[in-house]
Amino acid sequence: MPCIQAQYGTPATSPGPRDHLTGDPLALEFSKPTMDLASPETAPTAPATLPSFSTFMDGGYTGEFDTFLYQLPGTAQPCSSASSTSSSSSSATSPASASFKFEDFQVYGCYPGTLSGPLDETLSSSGSDYYGSPCSAPSPPTPNFQPSQLSPWDGSFGHFSPSQTYEGLRVWTEQLPKASGPPPPPTFFSFSPPTGPSPSLAQSSLKLFPAPATHQLGEGESYSVPAAFPGLAPTSPNCDTSGILDAPVTSTKARSGSSGGSEGRCAVCGDNASCQHYGVRTCEGCKGFFKRTVQKSAKYICLANKDCPVDKRRRNRCQFCRFQKCLAVGMVKEVVRTDSLKGRRGRLPSKPKQPPDASPTNLLTSLIRAHLDSGPNTAKLDYSKFQELVLPRFGKEDAGDVQQFYDLLSGSLDVIRKWAEKIPGFIELSPGDQDLLLESAFLELFILRLAYRSKPGEGKLIFCSGLVLHRLQCARGFGDWIDNILAFSRSLHSLGVDVPAFACLSALVLITDRHGLQDPRRVEELQNRIASCLKEHMAAVAGDPQPASCLSRLLGKLPELRTLCTQGLQRIFCLKLEDLVPPPPIVDKIFMDTLSF
């Protein structure tokens, strides 16, 4: 079949069809372009000689553009080799060359897309001169064209140089036959020399290999090839470049040994991170920020919408969002040590002071000592005012009897206050709670302590000051209340309560829940300790087969004590109405504060 062979070599002064092509490779139209050989623009493009095909393979062509072989289909009239002097006239008269289309050529080269034509499309062994260039359709030959020597990355496409991503290769495969199954990832192309003189596309060795799925180029990175191929300079057509094209693409950062993805990056701000801190790979800055925040229990406030960006450049702008991101990526607050000294210098923290009477034995001993110290000496009782034979007087009480009643109450209050201060744990309460407990339990403690010291069988009442009075001596001032106190004293003595049990019972009357306490939890803890101490003592009493029943009977006296307290308030109220003697301020205050409860 006769053919016409053409090669690049158009003189610089002769304009060619390439000048009419647009600079945008995306704007090139490959849909059946038509060429007229009779045109004056294409007439002088025929070279003087028609070299053989080996010229392309052995001539050492180093131009920038690829080499293509054009083969015209045979017609009824054979096509002879054209010369430079007769190409104009023969093209105008020959029926074979009168008009033909670009698709009638057999093209050996690299071009994107698929040219629709009756002939098979082929691929030549001379692919792109540099890796990753978007191959475009070749221009018609221009005689004596001298390509400029450019770097392998600065092609003639100018602003349309190949991008450094894999997206530019996507359009190369859009017109390939669709394969069944899920779409493959972006691929690289590798062209090998054809095995036959005119292989088809189905027979051409088109190698596809997927790009690394996890590798992404960072900012400022560039493509590079393995060390076996140090450069990608333009090579001659007869040089096999399939090895270079088949080599996987690696980045500069990948060659240095760092893996792709987020490994080696701070999970909070994206800065360099060498190891894990508090369960997450973070940088030193975010590690220190998280540690300081947890140790100081710092509270931050976001001035925006709590969605501030946290990166290497803006991580110090919003501390709230930075700490929230630390928690979101998985940093654990419990891992942070909070017992470290500031600067790891200074004195060790002092040990918390333990109360000296923490054990039940020590607590019981302290309660007994407090009770004995607050009571009168039985060997030195004051009988100076005691009168056993007193004639009963009928009628209203006089001012002397009322004043005696008020004096006995006021004197007991000072003694009870000193006794309470010796109870372990009482002085550790707030002053407000101490006053509230004393004023609320004063009348109950007055009755309990008086009933325990007195001798109801003899009618003797022994007060805290050591003063001994007969029941009849107190009848006008105390009224019927004194008889109820003596009855309570008989029942209390019938239980055989010893001093340790009575000391614990008195403390329980004082240390109890009251309305208006500032720290009721501490009062409850102290009450539980005293109750445990009383329970252990009752269980250790020898000769008692049922300590639980004895304890319940003892604690059953507390409701009776509350009833007697109410009767005492009623007596004070009656004396206030008679207004014979004004009550002391402390008694009046206790009455007014306790009456509402």
UniProtKB/Swiss-Prot annotation:
CDD domains assigned: NR_DBD_NGFI-B (cd06969), NR_LBD_NGFI-B (cd07348)
Family annotation (Gene3D superfamilies): Erythroid Transcription Factor GATA-1, subunit A, Retinoid X Receptor
Span list, region Required for nuclear import: 170-465
DNA-binding region: 263-338
SUPFAM superfamilies referenced in this protein's UniProt entry, alphabetically: Glucocorticoid receptor-like (DNA-binding domain) (SSF57716), Nuclear receptor ligand-binding domain (SSF48508)
Residue numbers carrying Phosphoserine: 340, 350
Keywords: Acetylation, Cytoplasm, DNA-binding, Inflammatory response, Metal-binding, Mitochondrion, Nucleus, Phosphoprotein, Receptor, Transcription, Transcription regulation, Zinc, Zinc-finger
Chain spans, region Binds lipopolysaccharide: 520-543
Effect of residue 348 to V: Almost complete loss of NBRE binding
Keyword Iron-sulfur found: no
Top-level taxon of the source organism: Eukaryota
Induction cue: By nerve growth factor and during liver regeneration.
Region annotation (Disordered) ranges: 1-22, 341-360
Region (AF-2): 583-594
Any one GO cellular component localisation term in the record: cytosol
Cofactor(s), names only, from the UniProt record: Zn(2+)
Zinc finger (NR C4-type): 266-286, 302-326
GO MF assignments: DNA binding; DNA-binding transcription activator activity, RNA polymerase II-specific; DNA-binding transcription factor activity, RNA polymerase II-specific; double-stranded DNA binding; identical protein binding; lipopolysaccharide binding; nuclear glucocorticoid receptor binding; nuclear receptor activity
Effect of residue 350 to A: Loss of phosphorylation
PROSITE patterns cross-referenced by the UniProt entry: NR_LBD, NUCLEAR_REC_DBD_1, NUCLEAR_REC_DBD_2
Domain notes for this protein: The NR LBD domain binds the lipid A moiety of lipopolysaccharide (LPS) in the cytosol.
Function as written in the Swiss-Prot or TrEMBL entry: Orphan nuclear receptor. Binds the NGFI-B response element (NBRE) 5'-AAAGGTCA-3'. Binds 9-cis-retinoic acid outside of its ligand-binding (NR LBD) domain. Participates in energy homeostasis by sequestrating the kinase STK11 in the nucleus, thereby attenuating cytoplasmic AMPK activation. Regulates the inflammatory response in macrophages by regulating metabolic adaptations during inflammation, including repressing the transcription of genes involved in the citric acid cycle (TCA). Inhibits NF-kappa-B signaling by binding to low-affinity NF-kappa-B binding sites, such as at the IL2 promoter. In the cytosol, upon its detection of both bacterial lipopolysaccharide (LPS) and NBRE-containing mitochondrial DNA released by GSDMD pores during pyroptosis, it promotes non-canonical NLRP3 inflammasome activation by stimulating association of NLRP3 and NEK7.
Subunit structure: Binds the NGFI-B response element (NBRE) as a monomer. Binds the Nur response element (NurRE), consisting of two inverse NBRE-related octanucleotide repeats separated by 6 base-pairs, as a dimer. Interacts (via N-terminus) with NLRP3 (via LRR repeat domain); the interaction is direct, requires binding of NR4A1/Nur77 to NBRE-containing dsDNA and lipopolysaccharide, and leads to non-canonical NLRP3 inflammasome activation. Interacts with GADD45GIP1. Interacts with STK11. Interacts with IFI27.
Family classification: Belongs to the nuclear hormone receptor family. NR4 subfamily.
Record's protein name: Nuclear receptor subfamily 4 group A member 1
The organism of origin for this protein: Rattus norvegicus
Classification lineage: Eukaryota, Metazoa, Chordata, Craniata, Vertebrata
Designated gene of the protein: Nr4a1
